[in-house]
From Swiss-Prot:
Catalytic activity: a plastoquinone + NADH + (n+1) H(+)(in) = a plastoquinol + NAD(+) + n H(+)(out); a plastoquinone + NADPH + (n+1) H(+)(in) = a plastoquinol + NADP(+) + n H(+)(out)
Assembly and oligomerization: NDH is composed of at least 16 different subunits, 5 of which are encoded in the nucleus.
Family of the protein in this entry: Belongs to the complex I subunit 6 family.
Chief site of localization: plastid
Protein name per UniProt: NAD(P)H-quinone oxidoreductase subunit 6, chloroplastic
Gene name for this UniProt entry: ndhG
InterPro entries: NAD(P)H-Q_Oxidoreduct_6, NADH_UbQ/plastoQ_OxRdtase_su6, Nuo/plastoQ_OxRdtase_6_NuoJ
GO molecular function, one term: NADH dehydrogenase (ubiquinone) activity
Its membrane topology: Multi-pass membrane protein
Ranges that cross the membrane: 10-30, 32-52, 61-81, 92-112, 152-172
Gene Ontology CC: one annotated term: chloroplast thylakoid membrane
Pfam families recorded: Oxidored_q3
EC number: 7.1.1.-
Role noted for this protein: NDH shuttles electrons from NAD(P)H:plastoquinone, via FMN and iron-sulfur (Fe-S) centers, to quinones in the photosynthetic chain and possibly in a chloroplast respiratory chain. The immediate electron acceptor for the enzyme in this species is believed to be plastoquinone. Couples the redox reaction to proton translocation, and thus conserves the redox energy in a proton gradient.
Length: 176
């Protein structure tokens, strides 16, 4: 989207805060249905980030696949789960939780420090002139297909193998 600078910056901050609030909701809410709705908020904010960066195809795919299918599947799985058997084994705090929270807090502080120290306006976000001419001739979905079949072929195939193994594992767990 070609928006003026202040509006674009406001939308970035608004969507970023939506991501943070949704992520905290996924982790901190005790009701799993509310956590799934918070995950939906996170996925919608990510999709809107893609549309702000002029990747409309990826934004639509994000909405259709992750929000429309995966999040609904998670909601159905959570609703069919028996929550009473999981709440019996609840311990409030362990030593591993303290170590994990310490590590996560230190990573979070280092990320915030890096983000605040970076000069974002010094980064050149434009492309070269020959890339602009090449991108105008090919559509967005064609560019994704070309990159998936050339530059990102090996990672794409590795991700498909990982998804296949996780699907086989989920079927094996469901049969038991």
């Amino acid at each position: 989207m070609d928006l003026p600078g202040p509006i674009h910056d406001f939308l970035l901050v608004f969507l970023g805060s939506g991501l943070i609030v949704g992520g905290l909701g996924v982790v901190l809410l005790t009701n799993p249905i509310f956590s799934a709705f918070s995950l939906g908020l996170v996925l919608v904010c990510i999709s809107l980030f893609f549309s702000l960066s002029n990747s409309y195809f990826v934004a639509a795919a994000q909405l259709l696949i992750y929000v429309g299918a995966i999040n609904v599947l998670i909601l159905f799985a959570v609703m069919f789960m028996n929550g009473s058997e999981y709440s019996k084994d609840l311990t409030l705090w362990t030593v591993g939780d303290g170590i994990t929270s310490l590590v996560c807090t230190s990573i979070f502080i280092s990320l915030i420090t890096t983000i605040l120290d970076t000069s974002w306006y010094g980064i050149i976000w434009t492309t070269k002139s020959n890339q602009i001419i090449e991108q105008d001739l090919i559509g967005n979905s064609q560019q994704i297909g070309i990159h998936l079949s050339t530059d990102f072929f090996l990672p794409f195939e590795l991700i498909s193998i990982i998804l296949l193994v996780s699907l086989i594992g989920a079927i094996a767990v469901a049969r038991q």
